[in-house]
Each structure stands twice: as C-alpha cells, then as structure tokens.
Amino acid sequence: MNWAAAVCWALLLAATFLCDGSAAKGGRGGARGSARGGRGAARVRVRPAPRYAGSSMRVAAGAAAGAAAGAAAGLAAGSSWRRAAGPAELGPEDAEDGAPGSNGTGRGVYSYWAWTSGTGPTGHRHLCPLLGGALGALRLLRP
C-alpha cells in the first residue's frame, strides 16, 4: 500500500474519532415497553448505556491498523514485489499484440481512457489534501 492510501486511512480514522459523538444512541430508538408512560410511573428519564458504543471507532481503528500494516509490508518488501503497470505503462503481457496469430489490435483500442476521453489518465494524488481541506472547511475536524 502506498503512503497516500495510508494517509487517507489515517485521515478517515481521525475524522471518525473526532466526529463520533459520545452521546450517539445505538440500537433501537424511542421508548420501549412500559417506558412509554405506564400508569403511576414517575417521569424520570433513565438513559442506559448505548448498545453499540464506539462500534464505528472500532471499525475505523481496524481499518487504520490494516492500512498501517499494509504500508509496513510494502516497505518491508521493497522492490522484491513486481509493481503493477499503470495505464500509461507497458507490462509483460502487452507484447502479445505483435505475436503471430493475434488480431493485431493496439494497446489503446480496448482501453477505458481511449474510449472516454482524448487525454491520458490523470493522477489522483490531490485527493487526501482535498479531503482534509474539505473537512476542515466544514469544521468537521474539531473535537
């Protein structure tokens, strides 16, 4: 996993931690059973502990831990793993077009980018700063 993905997961974990309300109610909402207003009952509101308190936090923490483990594994492996070829790069399978018995179509004929736009693929490296800036502008990253 590359660093951009690890940073995105860390941002997701931070946003979940800061936006997860401690008063968030889990389970079924509303009054249940005799708490709806039985006869002679005192009107005292007792709030039990939420059923699923912090479940989103546990999921986000697990996702961030997985992202960190993936980034660490990627660093440990280093150059021993073969990196997948991107849309603008040639891989070992791309030499099949010139092989005898092939239909001779070029690489760009069946490409998604060739059919949808006249430009090449663009990098999405600005997604994490954009996400952080948007969350900051919406004031969602405050405690």
Swiss-Prot record:
Protein name: Shadow of prion protein
Example GO biological process: protein import into nucleus
Organism field: Bos taurus
Alphabetical UniProt keywords: Amyloid, Cell membrane, Glycoprotein, GPI-anchor, Lipoprotein, Membrane, Prion, Signal
Prosegment residue ranges: 118-143
Glycan attachment residues as annotated in the record: N103
Localisation: Cell membrane
Residues with lipid group (GPI-anchor amidated serine): S117
UniProt KW NADP keyword: no
GO molecular function: nucleic acid binding
UniProt topology in membrane: Lipid-anchor; GPI-anchor
Gene: SPRN
